[in-house]
Amino acid sequence: MFQGQRGWFCGSVSQDLRQFWVAEGGTISDPRAADFLFSCDASHPDTLRIYQSLDYIEDNATVFHAYYLSAVANAKIKNSVALGHFILPPACLQKEIRRKIGSFIWEQDQHFLIEKHDEVTPNEIKTLRENSELATEHKKELSKSPEKHFIRTPVVEKQMYFPLQNYPVNNMVTGYISIDAMKKFLGELHDFIPGTSGYLAYHVQNEINMSAIKNKLKRK
């Protein structure tokens, strides 16, 4: 699953999840060399250093909640878990995000929190390691592709996603409003042609006085 990928782990991430990452073919590295940055606590000093870094400020780094790995471990289809659902924003933004869209996905699934210490058993890790070794040749073929599917701020490869109830209310901020919340208009749709139907179109330059334009139009 993570063959050849490098991950950095905050001190807030459990050893079980780190072992799962390695068992699935991933390696652990420092944050500068990592393809993925994982944390379970946005207020942890390790994670705060990431948020305060130039890479993060310039949008060249993204922190993900490490329970993404737990979701992968418990999923019937490993690549069916969308990484983007687990973006971990700075603590100062989380209250406002919860107010607008509800709790984060890892907060809703109490299974993650209750079974934190037994998410991945030693036997499961052994099995995963064996499966990872069997899949090595296949992964090598994939790595020859000219496309790089994972970068510092990952662009998640195309994969099967399962629908979530009340999406995106029970997920992260998407930046898009639901179609159900949009105002509805009845009647026929017509092309807008400037100068017809009593409407005109104007190009408004920067630093222009809108009040002066309105007064000029009224005088006409």
Swiss-Prot record:
One of its GO terms (biological process) is meiotic telomere clustering. It holds the Pfam family TERB2. Keywords: Chromosome, Membrane, Nucleus, Telomere. The keyword Signal does not apply. It is linked to Spermatogenic failure 59: An autosomal recessive male infertility disorder characterized by non-obstructive azoospermia, due to sperm maturation arrest. PANTHER family: TELOMERE REPEATS-BINDING BOUQUET FORMATION PROTEIN 2 (PTHR35345:SF1). The keyword Phosphoprotein does not apply. InterPro entries: TERB2 (IPR028065). Belongs to the TERB2 family. It is found in: Chromosome, Telomere; Nucleus inner membrane. GO terms for cellular component: chromosome, telomeric region; nuclear inner membrane. This is Telomere repeats-binding bouquet formation protein 2. Component of the MAJIN-TERB1-TERB2 complex, composed of MAJIN, TERB1 and TERB2. Disulfide bonds: none annotated. It comes from the Eukaryota. Meiosis-specific telomere-associated protein involved in meiotic telomere attachment to the nucleus inner membrane, a crucial step for homologous pairing and synapsis. Component of the MAJIN-TERB1-TERB2 complex, which promotes telomere cap exchange by mediating attachment of telomeric DNA to the inner nuclear membrane and replacement of the protective cap of telomeric chromosomes: in early meiosis, the MAJIN-TERB1-TERB2 complex associates with telomeric DNA and the shelterin/telosome complex.
